[in-house]
Amino acid sequence: MLTLDTLNVMLAVSEEGLIEEMIIALLASPQLAVFFEKFPRLKAAITDDVPRWREALRSRLKDARVPPELTEEVMCYQQSQLLSTPQFIVQLPQILDLLHRLNSPWAEQARQLVDANSTITSALHTLFLQRWRLSLIVQATTLNQQLLEEEREQLLSEVQERMTLSGQLEPILADNNTAAGRLWDMSAGQLKRGDYQLIVKYGEFLNEQPELKRLAEQLGRSREAKSIPRNDAQMEAFRTMVCEPATVPEQVDGLQQSDDILRLLPPELATLGITELEYEFYRRLVEKQLLTYRLHGESWREKVIERPVVHKDYDEQPRGPFIVCVDTSGSMGGFNEQCAKAFCLALMRIALAENRRCYIMLFSTEIVRYELSGPQGIEQAIRFLSQQFRGGTDLASCFRAIMERLQSREWFDADAVVISDFIAQRLPDDVTSKVKELQRVHQHRFHAVAMSAHGKPGIMRIFDHIWRFDTGMRSRLLRRWRR
């Protein structure tokens, strides 16, 4: 069956103009205008999505199938172009019957044109084909517009859902334009209002605890190890095979519009033999709009480039990713649980604003992992906030999981953060020695966020920094009184 993309090429219908008109109309819609005014940071993020919309619309038009009736009419039109005037006169009754059977918009006008002339001349033959072509162009344009209108409604519905989600979470998670852009990318998932209200709830709780929020910001500004390129690295030759277009064509690859006379399609060449269409042929030749075969060839060659033998040194630089371990034991329930979750939400906000990664691990009797800065970050955050803290405490497993993560290249410069009340058994000697080795050799930094004033000093001595946030009743009352 004929595709809409092929039909557009055959009739020289430009779908690009239709796509641009639809996108401009979408961006100018009242819903987006009000949203842009209310959330200016998200305007750039939505605008950056326009190329993706454009590509999706092109793909939709390219893959769309032309209705069988229109396909049959187009085939009949192409065959009629090849007929001489005497042959056309013989075939005309069958052509009119076919147009009537297909309910073509051109059927009634075609019959009126024939009935109004007693004899069929070559000029009438040319006029018939020209008007028929115009009718087909109108039908193709209408089909393009119908498909684009369907896509516009679907796209507008998707954008409105994402705007609702992003608008709710922007005050909580978007601290700058970078965070707003990443938040918009995350909003592409299938989420309902009740899902993300959990993030809103903990965002409001974080605003009620400014000391906790300030603690997260201080931790976010700390320094950690980061890889940097070496200046004195030796170079080595690296060989790879690259594919390049060949100068000699090898096979037919498709159709294209050009002025290549040697590769013309037969229907195009036939119009040159019709006197009335000769000027039309030359016009399309000058404008490079003639349908021709597209030929293609490939050749492979070896390419040699030089690259450094040793790529990286390591030095202290700010702003690496976060690896956060959260204690989910029973002693961390209640207010401690709220503070731990809100603190992770604050780290997620910092990670989005500074284009960092934020990886959460919950430890009790088993390890559960969430990445809050990935494409599914909002869904992962909702799952994390839905967890309840009712397990035991296995701090050793937590450290082993952190050290395993730090071995990978993408997390080599990460900050490790452990959130706990640190009421637990002492760490095994092998874990302690491995942590000290990472601190000494690779300059990794381990941070403790202590939720209790009764944490064991023997455990906490292993950390580079200890950030204290006492959740006892006395400390909570003092903080409230100071505010």
Swiss-Prot record:
Sorted UniProt keywords: Chaperone, Cytoplasm
- GO CC, one annotated term: cytosol
Major location (coarse): cytoplasm
Task: Spell out the InterPro entries in the cross-references.
Answer: Uncharacterised_CoxE, Uncharacterised_ViaA, VWF_A, vWFA_dom_sf
User: In which compartments does the protein localize?
Assistant: Cytoplasm
Name the coiled-coil region(s).
none
Q: Which Gene3D superfamilies match?
A: von Willebrand factor, type A domain
Q: How does it assemble?
A: Homodimer. Interacts with RavA.
Function of the molecule: Component of the RavA-ViaA chaperone complex, which may act on the membrane to optimize the function of some of the respiratory chains. ViaA stimulates the ATPase activity of RavA.
Concerning its family, UniProt says: Belongs to the ViaA family.
What is the name listed in the Swiss-Prot or TrEMBL entry for this protein? Regulatory protein ViaA
**Can you name the source organism?**
Escherichia coli (strain 55989 / EAEC)
Instruction: Tell me the lineage of the source organism.
Output: Bacteria, Pseudomonadati, Pseudomonadota, Gammaproteobacteria, Enterobacterales
